[in-house]
Amino acid sequence: MIFPVARYALRWLRRPEDRAFSRAAMEMALRGVRKVLCVAEKNDAAKGIADLLSNGRMRRREGLSKFNKIYEFDYHLYGQNVTMVMTSVSGHLLAHDFQMQFRKWQSCNPLVLFEAEIEKYCPENFVDIKKTLERETRQCQALVIWTDCDREGENIGFEIIHVCKAVKPNLQVLRARFSEITPHAVRTACENLTEPDQRVSDAVDVRQELDLRIGAAFTRFQTLRLQRIFPEVLAEQLISYGSCQFPTLGFVVERFKAIQAFVPEIFHRIKVTHDHKDGIVEFNWKRHRLFNHTACLVLYQLCVEDPMATVVEVRSKPKSKWRPQALDTVELEKLASRKLRINAKETMRIAEKLYTQGYISYPRTETNIFPRDLNLTVLVEQQTPDPRWGAFAQSILERGGPTPRNGNKSDQAHPPIHPTKYTNNLQGDEQRLYEFIVRHFLACCSQDAQGQETTVEIDIAQERFVAHGLMILARNYLDVYPYDHWSDKILPVYEQGSHFQPSTVEMVDGETSPPKLLTEADLIALMEKHGIGTDATHAEHIETIKARMYVGLTPDKRFLPGHLGMGLVEGYDSMGYEMSKPDLRAELEADLKLICDGKKDKFVVLRQQVQKYKQVFIEAVAKAKKLDEALAQYFGNGTELAQQEDIYPAMPEPIRKCPQCNKDMVLKTKKNGGFYLSCMGFPECRSAVWLPDSVLEASRDSSVCPVCQPHPVYRLKLKFKRGSLPPTMPLEFVCCIGGCDDTLREILDLRFSGGPPRASQPSGRLQANQSLNRMDNSQHPQPADSRQTGSSKALAQTLPPPTAAGESNSVTCNCGQEAVLLTVRKEGPNRGRQFFKCNGGSCNFFLWADSPNPGAGGPPALAYRPLGASLGCPPGPGIHLGGFGNPGDGSGSGTSCLCSQPSVTRTVQKDGPNKGRQFHTCAKPREQQCGFFQWVDENTAPGTSGAPSWTGDRGRTLESEARSKRPRASSSDMGSTAKKPRKCSLCHQPGHTRPFCPQNR
């Protein structure tokens, strides 16, 4: 199922400011509710929540997806005894993508992607989950969203809401808000249901759409171009771009270039040591260092000449080592990388698993402040049984309880990461990460380490030197937190004013060192500082630049940019656009926050950001050679390209608006070289106008038809095959196919298809006329002198008159060529019968040889009947049936049409074999006709209406096709014996068949 993004809204939802419901309101809202559908973000979460709410008495059954089970249990919800049906999705249920015609890389110029329509659809691997939700929704009266309470979780919740409300629009929707899967948390969530927050979901929609547009446009631009320029190196390489990827890569490149540009400098310093009976003490120069050798040498010589040291000051003061702050996501990623050597992606994967198992709180949080209503004492008590840290947990309780060190950040959604349940059954990295979270939590709730710092300052030849010592008095949190180190450094006792002879006074040289390459923790810190990504996406962006080979890792796990990464950053920087800098993306992240807060409109942010990146893209394409030059430094000289068009598909130029969906129709080329107009809404809209195969060249002219609506409808330049047009007509001319010129439509034999082909659906030839006329007639009047304009009017005036019957025995097909005479060889009632067919197979012309010959004037009148009627569908408004003249006023002599109304009788006025022949048709206006047609002179039982005989897929009628399958009566029999009327197999009434039965509509 496809969901247009622009229409994705739930108007019944109240504003998030009023999202809390009173208990009385909830009891009223849920009155009469018997079954409640609950949907979590993952199966493990659904199982855990259901187990806690049901006290372990849930009933499990299978869903349509084998990975997402269904858990049922009885529950008392707001005064109602209800059955809770708990199931899950697997992350995002829907995905963003361009409409089908833009998905292939060669389908359009990448610039189009900034404006191309985007849709939300359900990926194939999630269809079973979607069907499960639809099936369960039909049995339920309310829906409760149990997805994670962050931006992504809120958006996933709205995807679930969209799917469920499509099945049951009046479904009540509620939101459960929780931060951990514990009995208290989930029951509290059930007792305080709120409504989903549309604004938070909107922010995610904006971010997803921008990431798709920007990423797809730049990725296609880079990949298509650089693969052509450097085929030997990049032929198989996907060169992706992302507005978070590139700033992340930029940090790595910037540090690497800083190291490359670093010039070491020699410095000099004076070092003093004193060999005391209690140990060797090193005194540091208060000047630290000097870069001037002579100056340092002079001071050193003064110290050597008078080396006696005088103690000028002895200070002693308390020193504390702070315990860690409450743990948020970014700190978890950084500390796990530094202390445990687990990368950020793996850290978050393990943390998610521990969360769904109920061992820790929600791991994606920006909060480092414990809320006052969170019972920390209970959480500390849970850890007392452990032999490793249980005694420390007990000591916290004995000293008056936990006193956490809080930070200053809160996302108002989740508390800091903390353990929620004790376990000793974990293994490997899961056990290591769980232990780290527990120890961090206990350390945070403990006390700072305490010590006494002593500072001794001495004077030698008026130069000052300092030594520091430390005595730890209370380790406190250090006893449970081995990831921090704080050691004693003993200083001997010195008295102020005392003198001593230093053991050594020496001048030592050193050299400044460059900064180190970034570690993952360093990179995450930079991303957070500059607002690149969120705590939930940092790891993903880092993994992407590694997977694309933009960066690699050194043996000590530091990031080193690759040649491709360096070339891309340098190339864009040389264009004047610092796309590797964080400013553009940081601005977007700030806007997304404002959308969540209701301070900015999502559409305004979307429009501004698209235009900003689109302008950058246009100029980047114009300066693309700078990108080539930057990469050539690493890959060697590449292939020269003459023009941009050698790489990117041309921008499709719209000819007119589609009469079905109002999207642009563009000129395209068929595989065999022919031309047609295709709707940009394909495949949802399959409208197309097929030009005949005799058209050798077709292109859009700059002129616009002044008549056809809606404006603009561009004219076409056409060049025809020699001999395909009457001799009096030019082979090249400019014309309008917007529907204003009936004669031109007949000359071009325009064919229009409005839907997907079916096996039983014949291909008609005048549906172009049907659609074009509808557009033409319904939107502007057609004065008699304006129907033919410009060159098409001149063409119409030079048309030869129709050939009189008997002047030639040749039969002409719809292409204007002489048809070929063939004989039926297949076994059956028509074996041996001869028929005419298109010689080239280009058109669908077909005519039995023993049928009346229409002559060279064109194909038989029946061949002009519309496609829709062959399936029982009424022709569209404005349809002109070829060969039919003006409507007559006669009644149908008792014959009824498909509307069960009396038909009218009309007469064929157009020259041809059927001129003067009468027929019955629907009496309603052309726009409302049911499609009924019957010749008056056909032998039909009085008072009955025959089934319509619309053209089949090869020019013969369905009625004659049905007759050909039965034994054929002799001509005398057919002339003297009335046919038995056929009956419908559905209602058993004569006059029509099942496809045309009113009961089958």
UniProtKB/Swiss-Prot annotation:
Gene name in the database record:
TOP3A
Under the cellular component aspect of Gene Ontology, which terms does the record hold? mitochondrial matrix; mitochondrion; nucleoplasm; nucleus; PML body; RecQ family helicase-topoisomerase III complex
Q: Which residues bind Zn(2+) 2?
A: 897, 899, 922, 930
Catalytic activity of the protein: ATP-independent breakage of single-stranded DNA, followed by passage and rejoining
MF terms in GO? DNA binding; DNA topoisomerase type I (single strand cut, ATP-independent) activity; single-stranded DNA binding; zinc ion binding
Give the compositionally biased regions (Polar residues): 774-792
Task: State its Enzyme Commission number(s).
Answer: 5.6.2.1
- What is the recorded name of this protein? DNA topoisomerase 3-alpha
Give the tissue specificity: High expression is found in testis, heart, skeletal muscle and pancreas.
Tell me where it resides.
Mitochondrion matrix
